[in-house]
């Protein structure tokens, strides 16, 4: 009996994680664009999904709606999200554009409420150290945009990571309750640790590719492993 109980305990961690759901992003099937234009395209010889803000979104100005690509039919609360992403500045973008690109999770039905990690690729090798320190960011819309987090909690939700615009970058997001961690470039230590995810410990929602309207983004090889 003792051996049986021990065996069940050993198996328990494995049963907590569902089988990974894989999205190569080499087609637009199963994707719902929100205020963006999507198409398959190659970057650095690798095929993926190209994402840009729609003309209507660009015309709406700085206070416009979110730019997302929703993964249809997938609900996520806790688990691991992995992908290769790339961000660069679109032609004609204003001077302050940084090529924001990332992944949103626990996206609610209003498409405005979510948590996200994103990168600012043009900050990664800037000559200004302050800009470098703002290379990776956590946000929680609509109540906690980056500028509010930076104003009220300087440096807590941002960090440095080496980035090059227009280049594939591996990212991994681990979410467990109110804790989330961002890993970049496949390293073992997280780039950014958040211990008070604003959506709360039990929130669930969709996953979406996330961009700023002044970004030309590419995504590929998205994998989602949900914790059951």
Question: Where are the regions a protein language model picked out?
Answer:
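Hydrophobic h-region of N-terminal signal peptides that target proteins for export
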Residues: 10-18
């Amino acid at each position: 009996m003792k051996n049986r109980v021990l065996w069940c305990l050993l198996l328990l961690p494995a049963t907590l994680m569902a089988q990974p759901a894989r999205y190569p992003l080499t087609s637009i099937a199963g994707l719902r664009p929100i205020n963006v234009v999507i198409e398959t395209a190659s970057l650095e010889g690798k095929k993926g999904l190209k994402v840009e803000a729609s003309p209507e979104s660009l015309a709406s100005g700085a206070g416009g709606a979110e730019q997302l690509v929703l993964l249809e039919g997938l609900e996520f609360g806790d688990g691991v999200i992995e992908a290769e992403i790339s961000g660069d500045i679109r032609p004609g973008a204003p001077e302050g554009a940084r090529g924001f690109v990332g992944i949103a999770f626990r996206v609610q039905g209003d498409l405005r409420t979510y948590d996200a990690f994103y990168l600012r690729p043009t900050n990664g090798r800037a000559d200004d150290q302050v800009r470098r320190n703002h290379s990776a960011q956590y946000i929680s819309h609509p109540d906690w945009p980056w500028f509010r987090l930076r104003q009220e909690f300087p440096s807590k939700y941002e960090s440095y990571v080496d980035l090059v615009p227009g280049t594939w970058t591996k990212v991994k997001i681990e979410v467990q309750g109110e804790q989330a961690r961002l890993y970049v470039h496949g390293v073992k230590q997280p780039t950014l640790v958040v211990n008070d995810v604003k959506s709360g410990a039990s929130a669930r929602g969709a996953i979406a590719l996330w961009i700023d309207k002044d970004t030309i983004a590419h995504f590929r090889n998205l994998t989602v492993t949900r914790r059951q």
